[in-house]
Amino acid sequence: MIRVGLILCCIFIAGVFEASSADDMLTAHNLIKRSEVKPPSSSEFIGLMGRSEELTRRLIQHPGSMSETSKRGPPKKVSRRPYILKK
């Protein structure tokens, strides 16, 4: 009879512990869900045409873009052992 009481007591304590940890998880989830995050600005929602226009504007403003570097030709060959001086 005492063993049955101990088993039921352990089950009750485990249930209470499980319920309290579930409440903590819900609280953490609600805090994450309600965290103060700034809503995205309207400039972040650019249509596909707007993105292409913005991209071409960036390429024109920055002359070191990939289109410019591809016109320069292949890269120069560099010695694999720069510490050896050529005579």
Curated annotation (Swiss-Prot):
The protein's superkingdom reads Eukaryota
Keyword annotations of the record: Amidation, Neuropeptide, Secreted, Signal
The record's subcellular locations are: Secreted
- Name the InterPro entries on file: Tachy_Neuro_lke_CS (IPR013055)
On whether Secreted is a keyword of this UniProt record, the answer is yes
Provide the free-text tissue specificity comment from this protein's UniProt record.
Answer: Expressed in the posterior salivary gland and more specifically in the mucus-secreting gland cells.
Question: For bias kind Basic residues, which ranges apply?
Answer: 73-87
Q: Which residues form the signal peptide?
A: 1-22
Record bears the keyword Signal? yes
Which GO terms of the cellular component aspect does the record hold?
extracellular region
GO BP, one annotated term: neuropeptide signaling pathway
**Quick one: where's region Disordered?**
61-87
Q: Where is the PTM Methionine amide found along the chain?
A: M49
The entry's propeptide annotation covers 23-37, 52-87
Q: Which family does it belong to?
A: Belongs to the tachykinin family.
Q: What is its biological role?
A: Tachykinins are active peptides which excite neurons, evoke behavioral responses, are potent vasodilators and secretagogues, and contract (directly or indirectly) many smooth muscles.
Return the protein name. Answer: Tachykinin-1
